[in-house]
Amino acid sequence: MPFRIEAPYQPTGDQPQAIEKLVAGLRAGYRHQTLLGATGTGKTFVMAHIFAQIQRPTLVLAHNKTLVSQLWAEFREFLPDAAVEMFISYYDEYTPEAYVPSKDLYIEKEASINEEIDRLRHAATQALLTRRDVLIVASVSAIFGLGSPHDYGQEKIHLRTGEVRNRDKLLRQLIDLQFERNDVDFQRGTFRVRGDTLDIIPANAETAIRVEFWGDEIERIVELDPLTGEVLLKHTAVEIYPAKHFVTTKEKLQLAIVSIQAELNERLQELEAAGKLLEAQRLKQRTLYDLEMLSEVGYCSGIENYSRHLDGRAPGQTPWTLLDYFPDDFLMFIDESHITIPQLRGMYNGDRQRKQTLVDYGFRLPSALDNRPLKFEEFEQHVYQVIYVSATPGPYEREKSEQIVEQIIRPTGLLDPEIEVRPTRGQIDDLLGEIRRRVERKQRVLVTTLTKRMAEDLADYLKEMGVRTMYLHADIDTIERVEILRDLRLGVYDVVVGINLLREGLDLPEVSLVAILDADKEGYLRSETSLIQIIGRAARHIEGKVIMYADTITRSMEVAIRETQRRREIQMAHNVRHGITPQGIAKGVRDLTDRIRKVAEERGEYVTTPETAVPVDLPRDEVLKLIKDLEKQMKQAAKALAFEKAAALRDQIVELRQALALSE
């Protein structure tokens, strides 16, 4: 019985044959297949159908957090009964530990962990250990070191009503699982004790588990809202998984401490023999402090650097990653594989180079080198069956694939966009005229440039000309980037200018024009693959058009234009043959940040005070600044447990965004 797909439409266009061929390939035992799908042909829908028919745990790898968020939201809609989870880096801000010998500069690791994303990571790993109908959408974080799935799964605590359980012993078990006791600031990964009642917020949950004792007997287990205390569900049994992925047994911890001490002694001898006395002293001081922390509390800052000892692995042995939480027969999709595959290849070398310097200068033991991402060869060994998904598959996918399935026809009958090449002379004025024509028709525009400076200058110029413009650049964090793209769709902005951020996987049906500046400058950003991907951003609109500003036609431009024309002719012939009239895509604007940034599910009965009321006469730029300021205040209020204030601020933000979206 296939898993249930929920969608207001059935597979059409090229989708049915793509699903049929790829499923047949999987059942025939093909290890490598490629879905060559043009932009807007519904590749995500096809992936959901394949998952539903194959009925195996599935990993969808994507190359950035924005795309992961988008895919996760779509799969959750298509597969309401399945466990659709997300696994990305939980750092909002991250500066890795590093040492620059030329400046004698040590950079300490600084990280700001996003609690909500950490919760989603735990939800993903726990789903994999408890059920089969699991689809995880992940970034390359999937190949970075994670705690052992065996320890994570075996160390869980089973609680059942009616069983006799020594409460004090249970509290010690929770502490062993890295839970913290906190009777005041009750949050995820903590527990509190009140009389005969024990409350726990598991690492994967937003709700609390209350365990009520009668003496040493568990009398009742309920799930409740930690803020209001409202009982949501009654349970006969629950399982509490560790609060952190890096967890180990007491026996393994003791063995690890002995092993770390032995490695330290050996390394100190090496450094002293080489006359590196400063490095030896530094390493000794840092490692002994960590060992003391491990002995006393079972945890230390940077514990992941000792993961080889904690896991009992041999030097150089493959580390545990998210891939090890999957069963052997799992299915993998690699979305936008032409970008994701090279990214997977490059992870190991960059990490190794940075850590080798730390080891050489006595900041870390050599075993820290084994806290690393997978080498590409190790990643390949984890693959049971994989489907590469891309509009422009790379040489690796083409060479490996036993079958390449084309998906060119769109269900809506939409054609690939028309392409026009225009001279660079007077390009900005020409572009401004095109933008104004699109704005009159309530359409959106993407503009891609080659340099950050040019993108900034162009965005500033367009703003001066009265165009609602936003500049999308690499310094913008994940959540804000998602919000900018959402606001483009809502009409807060009419134009978004970017460099390399307007390519793979951006689903923006309102965009009718993509302008490519300096299209004839050969290079990575203007290769045939990049150009085809950029062109695809205009393929979801019935009036989709691409303007390349160039003075010559490069080979990459020629290939991209020819391939787009080939697909366009196939699509036109299909439409004529079946009497299809192209239709625009009507797609709701999902709030991809709904579970990553929120204070409460429902709007509360909160009153906005006159001092904080929304000003209606501010210029648009000032309102956008105000929204940012209010969001900061909302976060601070939520952190300080001032939930009424946080919810009131949230309501103001919603009102401001609605006002911006409606105003012209």
UniProtKB/Swiss-Prot annotation:
Motif (Beta-hairpin): 90-113
Single GO MF annotation: excinuclease ABC activity
InterPro entries xrefs: Helicase/UvrB_N (IPR006935), Helicase_ATP-bd (IPR014001), Helicase_C-like (IPR001650), P-loop_NTPase (IPR027417), UVR_dom (IPR001943), UVR_dom_sf (IPR036876), UvrB (IPR004807), UvrB_inter (IPR041471)
Binding site for ATP: G37, A38, T39, G40, T41, G42, K43, T44
Top-level lineage group: Bacteria
DNA-binding listed as a keyword: no
GO CC annotation terms, alphabetical: cytoplasm; excinuclease repair complex
Domain Helicase ATP-binding as annotated: residue spans: 24-182
Keyword Cell inner membrane: no
Protein location: Cytoplasm
UniProt keyword annotations, A-Z: ATP-binding, Cytoplasm, DNA damage, DNA excision, DNA repair, Excision nuclease, Helicase, Hydrolase, Nucleotide-binding, SOS response
Biological process per Gene Ontology, one example term: nucleotide-excision repair
Pfam families: Helicase_C, ResIII, UVR, UvrB, UvrB_inter
PROSITE patterns: HELICASE_ATP_BIND_1, HELICASE_CTER, UVR
Domain UVR as annotated: residue spans: 624-659
Helicase C-terminal domain span: 427-593
Domain note: The beta-hairpin motif is involved in DNA binding.
Subunit structure: Forms a heterotetramer with UvrA during the search for lesions. Interacts with UvrC in an incision complex.
Function: The UvrABC repair system catalyzes the recognition and processing of DNA lesions. A damage recognition complex composed of 2 UvrA and 2 UvrB subunits scans DNA for abnormalities. Upon binding of the UvrA(2)B(2) complex to a putative damaged site, the DNA wraps around one UvrB monomer. DNA wrap is dependent on ATP binding by UvrB and probably causes local melting of the DNA helix, facilitating insertion of UvrB beta-hairpin between the DNA strands. Then UvrB probes one DNA strand for the presence of a lesion.
UniProt record similarity statement: Belongs to the UvrB family.
NCBIfam families (alphabetical): PRK05298.1, uvrb
PANTHER family membership: UVRABC SYSTEM PROTEIN B (PTHR24029:SF0)
The protein's name: UvrABC system protein B
Natural source organism: Chloroflexus aggregans (strain MD-66 / DSM 9485)
Designated gene of the protein: uvrB
